[in-house]
Amino acid sequence: VKSALEPEWEAVFEPNSYGFRPGRSAHDAIQAIFTAISQKPKFVLDADISKCFDRINHKRLLEKLDTFPTFRRQIRAWLNAGVMDGKELFPTSEGTPQGGVISPLLANIALHGMENEIKSIAKGFNMKKPNGHQLSWQIKQRSVNIIRYADDFVILHEDITVVHRCKEV
């Protein structure tokens, strides 16, 4: 299932997503951060999505997958299989199986769209040129850097208020 899903999703994943992806590494994420801050000094929001893998909403993930019914049923079965702790089985109503081969891909699918969502919201921020004129929405979007490695991400911008507004999102 992973071998079938991964190429499809790799073709659409956001450009600044680095964790658990073929041909991408933590070094690539660090290079992206370095490139962003080398252009201009920037404020940084360093964030971690708390218990991300444990809290993935099964229903939303399955809706987002939009794949063959057979794959959906299999993935749903994996997600709902439960977790063994000793001899006791605990049901799972959310999250991905820890250590599961497909879990990192499912987490990336669940988080896909975060970068575009934040950049889309940034279009409405009050960002101005030094002369007081409002920046175009395209420049506003490009000025916000979001770099994600699995459930860790940074948001970089030269204006601290923009970073704070992104944090609220």
Regions found by a protein language model. Give the residues of each.
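Active-site substrate-recognition loop segments, prototypically the cytochrome P450 B′-helix/B-C loop
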Residues: 2-7, 11, 20
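Conserved polymerase palm-domain catalytic core
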Residues: 12-169
